Amino acid sequence: MRFQTTLVPARLIRRYKRFLADCQLEDGREVTAHCANPGSMMGLADPGTKIWLEPNDDPKKKLKFGWRLVDHENGHFTGVDTSVPNRALKTALERRAIPSLAAYETVRPEVKYGQNSRIDFLLSGPGLADAYVEVKSVTLCREPGLAEFPDSVTARGAKHLAELAAMAGLGHRAIMLYLVQRTDCDRFTLAADIDPAYARAFETARAQGVEKLILTTHISPQGVEIADML
């Protein structure tokens, strides 16, 4: 998945009200960017952090920049836009680039199911059980090389696990897919100390047949691509 416009570097001044970020461009101008991330962004939103913004000229958008990446200035990047995983995964699923899901011919995003929820992807194919795929973006790293989820309490995430378990109980494939939006991590774990209820919900869902799939990414200012399974 390539970004729609060329990203521009900036320095973060502050993130506030969750979805807003004041930034300084290289020419000294200060702009406010949209931050498409409802999480805590622990370790990613410190003032002075080098970031990459995507400009837009959409007259319908009040904010003319979107915050897409954190640049760790050591060759590694973290993707902070939580809409990116679904866009990148849709491309990978349609190309059948994920081995454990490559047999599915039809990819349907945002299908209603459960209790007023939408599954990120519903996959189907001749002779195959439907596969319900829920996607979570992983950006937290507190120990070198170890990605963690979640970075804040997520009651909604626990609800999604229960709904996946219900689909597994009906004979469908139910898959909890964690997409690691960091290039500096090669391991994954749940952050049970941050959200014990989510960790318990995950173990319950696994016991009821929900599958776990963890994917890494290639990230650069040009775009985000699905890489390997962990």
Curated annotation (Swiss-Prot):
- What CDD domains does its record include? SfsA-like_bacterial
- Recorded protein name is Sugar fermentation stimulation protein homolog
Q: Which PANTHER family match?
A: SUGAR FERMENTATION STIMULATION PROTEIN A (PTHR30545:SF2)
Membrane-spanning ranges: none
Q: Which GO terms describe its molecular function?
A: DNA binding
Q: Tell me the gene name.
A: sfsA
* InterPro entries referenced in this protein's UniProt entry, alphabetically: SfsA (IPR005224), SfsA_C (IPR040452), SfsA_N (IPR041465)
Disulfide connectivity? Answer: none
Q: One Pfam family for this entry, by name?
A: SfsA_N
Q: What family classification does the UniProt entry report for this protein?
A: Belongs to the SfsA family.
